[in-house]
Amino acid sequence: MINVTLPDGSKREYAEGASPLDVAESISKSLAKKALAAKVDGQMWDLVRPLEGDASVAIITDRDPEGLELIRHDAAHVLAQAVQELYPDTQVTIGPVIDDGFYYDFARKEPFSTDDFDKIEARMREIVDADYPIVREVLGKDEAIATFKSLGEEYKAQIIDDIIPPGEQITVYRQGKWFDLCRGPHLPSTGKLPKAFKLMKLAGAYWRGDHRNEMLQRMYGTAWANEKDLKDHLTRLEEAEKRDHRKLGAQLDLFHFQPEAQGSVFWHPKGFMIWRELEAYIRRQQDADGYVEVKTPQLLNSVFWEKSGHWSKFRENMFVVPDEIPSTESDAPILSGEGELMALKPMNCPAHVQIFKNAQRSYRDLPIRMAEFGCCHRNEAHGALHGLMRVRQMTQDDAHIFCREDQIADETLRFLKLFETVYGDFGLSEISYKLATRPEMRAGTDETWDRAEKALADALTAAGMTFSIAEGEGAFYGPKLEFHLTDAIGRTWQCGTFQLDYVLPERLDAEYTGSDGAKHRPVMLHRAVFGTFERFMGILIENYAGSFPLWMSPVQVVVAAITDAAGDYAEEAAAALRKAGLRVEVDKRNETINYKVREHSVQKVPVIAVVGAREAEDRKLALRRLGSNGQQIISLDEALVALADEARAPDLKRARS
């Protein structure tokens, strides 16, 4: 007999050879009907695969995250089968699950087109209707290679040959006559796959991500547990398209990119005005929280990066400045004569350690909270660049806290409060937290890791925050906290960082004198609230759909004159508003007021102050708010007080209350 422990702690006995499906059927027929797979001793398991001994078993349905991942995994297989049935000259390569969907890379001489999608989706539905049993088969490495080669599947054979150790068995999954290399698990049959799937787009992808290899065709799709979830997802995508920060950046004249500076942003006056507001805001928070601000070099010698460990672990992501500029047809090589190899900094932390080391430090000096709006460069692959979200030149609201080990919990709690305050001020109050724990490859002792993980967990608990554990996902030098934010249309973004580091102070020989008179290593806490200004601005643009709160808006008020006669009063009102601290433009063009209002609304100006002859005579303003059809007529003096107060940043409003 096999003893099975269920999630509620209860135990049941089953005959040898029982499967998770037998377990589900013994609980209820409805659960068996909903069952897609199982977790056996924490590992995903095919629903009909026999259990191999006593085990804990949890049934997976489409209500579980693992169930949705399984649906998407099977959708990728059904896609590959449909493509090969329709286009037999196609080779399959890889087809993983990704956020909200899946993709499959195909090798085919003729290019696919999005016009092919309807035909492919129709065949996918036919495969679902056929309800082919999905059968797990085990093959030896040599047999598997021979099998795939006999089918002309050179890519699959190469994967097996390169990745699978000699003598190790592999699994394939068969559905009808079609099969694929896969570790599984899968649904019991293709009929279990909901038809709530849709092909989305095509892209090119190099085999194994190497530009020296052949270009494949990547077909993206999305799959959900039911039609409603699919429809909701497609609606979110439509809304996200409207909010795309790259489109809004051009529409609102905030920034642009160009080929001569890939991954680096050209900030326009309006975009940089928002940047300045963000920088001033976060600087005030850090000043109030006891941070000191520093500025460190961008270009440092390779010897420096060798000491920090970045030269060996991060060099491929660094921009290296050679000592020699190669010759051209008309010029000889240019030599600096210094014989140095330099690199632009990819991060600020090693430079901050140098400032810490530049003075004798005592335990009484700690903690030292050192902040920098540091410009960093990372040599991201061209294909990975994505607007403001993924750039090569970035500015971080970076800070490092040098503290004693007994101060870790307090400093963590202090940062969590700062983080929640800041994100609440931007309307991003739905935050989930993860504690990423020790990875297999790590520095430090288990005792040190125990203390560090406990300190972070205790701080989260003390702050009243619910958190999940991301086992093994910490950095090699220490555990970290991950912050996941939900925006206005339900998308999740990972922002900000908080990482505990025992390694860098050791590598760079940072020390302080303890209360015992001996030298000790400080603990280094890496933290950022925004992360990078570029990415945070991209998130804000999309979260607000370009309609920024008044305090952030690059143009806060437009005074629009109805007639030429009101032009002088429009200028007078604008001057008074500017004196009150507002960013104001005047529109006296010979256009209708409706045209002006419409144009400034497209530019997302939050307040349009309309003035005509009557307003000029009465010294009033007719205020129209973005998104509202009505207007509020108030005196200029009242408008000055009300708008100046409304335009204050949230922290400045709190300071006045």
Curated annotation (Swiss-Prot):
SS bonds (residue pairs): none
Q: Per its UniProt record, what InterPro entries does this chain match?
A: aa-tRNA-synt_IIb, aa-tRNA-synth_II, aa-tRNA-synth_II/BPL/LPL, Anticodon-bd, Anticodon-bd_dom_sf, Beta-grasp_dom_sf, TGS, TGS-like
The main place the protein resides is: cytoplasm
Entry keyword rRNA processing:
no
Which SUPFAM superfamilies did the record assign? Class II aaRS ABD-related, Class II aaRS and biotin synthetases, TGS-like, ThrRS/AlaRS common domain
Any note on cofactor binding? Answer: Binds 1 zinc ion per subunit.
Domain (TGS): residue spans on this chain: 1-61
Substrates-to-products reaction catalysed: tRNA(Thr) + L-threonine + ATP = L-threonyl-tRNA(Thr) + AMP + diphosphate + H(+)
Keyword Cell cycle set for record: no
Molecular function, one GO term = metal ion binding
Cofactor field? Zn(2+)
Q: Which GO terms describe its biological process?
A: threonyl-tRNA aminoacylation
Entry's localization field:
Cytoplasm
Summarize the subunit comment.
Homodimer.
Q: What does this protein do?
A: Catalyzes the attachment of threonine to tRNA(Thr) in a two-step reaction: L-threonine is first activated by ATP to form Thr-AMP and then transferred to the acceptor end of tRNA(Thr). Also edits incorrectly charged L-seryl-tRNA(Thr).
Name recorded for this polypeptide? Threonine--tRNA ligase
- Organism, per UniProt? Hyphomonas neptunium (strain ATCC 15444)
Q: What is the lineage of its organism?
A: Bacteria, Pseudomonadati, Pseudomonadota, Alphaproteobacteria, Hyphomonadales
